[in-house]
């Protein structure tokens, strides 16, 4: 009987998370923009990109630039 209540509670939590936008569930498996920048050979900078580099994206949820 306790198992069925636990399963029902878990199901309710998952459904409420999906109804609110599902940020937790969709965030699983996604890499941060900082990780993507650094792993592709870039640098995350808050200031302008150095000479001979270009902006390749963003870092820290759009607060910095990925320079490569």
Swiss-Prot record:
Its main location: secreted. Keywords: Antibiotic, Antimicrobial, Defensin, Disulfide bond, Membrane, Secreted, Signal. It is found in: Secreted; Membrane. Blood plasma. Sperm. Highly expressed in the lower head and midpiece of sperm. Significantly reduced levels found in the sperms of asthenozoospermia and leukocytospermia patients (at protein level). It holds the Pfam family Defensin_beta. GO terms for cellular component: extracellular exosome; extracellular region; extracellular space; Golgi lumen; membrane; microvesicle; sperm midpiece. GO terms for molecular function: CCR6 chemokine receptor binding; identical protein binding. Residues 1-21 form the signal peptide. Residues 22-32 form a propeptide. GO terms for biological process: antibacterial humoral response; antimicrobial humoral immune response mediated by antimicrobial peptide; calcium-mediated signaling; chemotaxis; defense response to bacterium; defense response to Gram-negative bacterium; defense response to Gram-positive bacterium; G protein-coupled receptor signaling pathway. Disulfide bonds join 37-66, 44-59, 49-67. Belongs to the beta-defensin family. Monomer. Homodimer. Has bactericidal activity. May act as a ligand for C-C chemokine receptor CCR6. Positively regulates the sperm motility and bactericidal activity in a CCR6-dependent manner. Binds to CCR6 and triggers Ca2+ mobilization in the sperm which is important for its motility. This is Beta-defensin 1. It comes from Homo sapiens (Human). The gene is DEFB1.
């Amino acid at each position: 009987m306790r198992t069925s209540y636990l399963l029902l509670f878990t199901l309710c939590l998952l459904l409420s998370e999906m109804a609110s936008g599902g940020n937790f569930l969709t965030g699983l498996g996604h890499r941060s923009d900082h990780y993507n920048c650094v792993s592709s050979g870039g640098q995350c900078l808050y200031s302008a990109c150095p000479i001979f580099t270009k902006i390749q994206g963003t870092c820290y949820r759009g607060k910095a630039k990925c320079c490569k």
